[in-house]
Amino acid sequence: MKKSTLALVVMGIVASASVQAAEIYNKDGNKLDVYGKVKAMHYMSDNASKDGDQSYIRFGFKGETQINDQLTGYGRWEAEFAGNKAESDTAQQKTRLAFAGLKYKDLGSFDYGRNLGALYDVEAWTDMFPEFGGDSSAQTDNFMTKRASGLATYRNTDFFGVIDGLNLTLQYQGKNENRDVKKQNGDGFGTSLTYDFGGSDFAISGAYTNSDRTNEQNLQSRGTGKRAEAWATGLKYDANNIYLATFYSETRKMTPITGGFANKTQNFEAVAQYQFDFGLRPSLGYVLSKGKDIEGIGDEDLVNYIDVGATYYFNKNMSAFVDYKINQLDSDNKLNINNDDIVAVGMTYQF
């Protein structure tokens, strides 16, 4: 049976969050696109801190300038604005991405700024739930696991034009010390490889990061050590309206917990989704992060939940969703991590 136009559009949206970018300028080798979304969302949970309005707006732009027939300059900025805060609240806006760089045809691109860490090249494959997910080892401003500051990033697609589907990332992160201790990092490097076997439906990926830790981090009561290290590997299948992905990762002296950092974590995520031609996309997933050798505790689950959800796409710009996070943490867990379930419901307009 032929895929419907709506199904094809939806799969494109899912593949790239900014696919709906609107071109507002394109002249003389200069191009500027804007994109964004309004997510009107409500959480329902026995955990008071997670119950209630969670609405927000995201807005960004991507620009390019053609320097010559080989060299292109580019930049990107993206911010998020809270929709559930009082107007007097100063903590309403945050910058998610802000970087600029140069791309030289088959040689690749190099940029600097606030960007996505190399480890997220693997973790992104399972970060696909309607609302939750992607939080076993990936955390914002946690070394190079997700969005982070001070990143110098080299990316090469199709391996210098020699191997179709083989993409390489090399990354360096400068130290960030003047912030909350769990958001700090020393100098570090990361790398990732993804390969889709020349455009096949299957893809594999792997990533590794290694960073200095700050002096303040080593004053914490848990997880002291000179280096923070992580590796991850993932698999993905994306064809015939089916999306399947999984990854496994380990971190050392990197994942924040009460009193400092986990000496080691073992992390697993999986997601399965099906895109119906009439717009419905059900989703089933699982997320687990197990802390190992924690001082005074031993081993303890840090994240453990089943996720059941669905998104309905009215068209390429409008969708509604529900996402049920079924928490599997023990009520008497030794780190006092909240174990309440959460149900998220909402609608999203994106362009």
Curated annotation (Swiss-Prot):
Induction: By phosphate starvation.
InterPro entries: Gram-neg_bact_OMP (IPR050298), Gram_neg_porin_domain (IPR033900), Porin_dom_sf (IPR023614), Porin_gammaproteobac (IPR001897), Porin_Gram-ve (IPR001702), Porin_Gram-ve_CS (IPR013793)
BP GO terms, sorted: monoatomic ion transmembrane transport
Membrane-topology descriptor: Multi-pass membrane protein
SUPFAM superfamilies according to UniProt: Porins (SSF56935)
GO MF annotations, alphabetized: porin activity
Location of this chain's protein in the cell: Cell outer membrane
Source superkingdom: Bacteria
One Pfam entry name: Porin_1
Similarity section: Belongs to the Gram-negative porin family.
Quaternary assembly: Homotrimer. Forms mixed heterotrimers with OmpC and with OmpF; other mixed heterotrimers are also probable.
PANTHER family: OUTER MEMBRANE PORIN PHOE, PROTEIN YDDL-RELATED
Name recorded for this polypeptide: Outer membrane porin PhoE
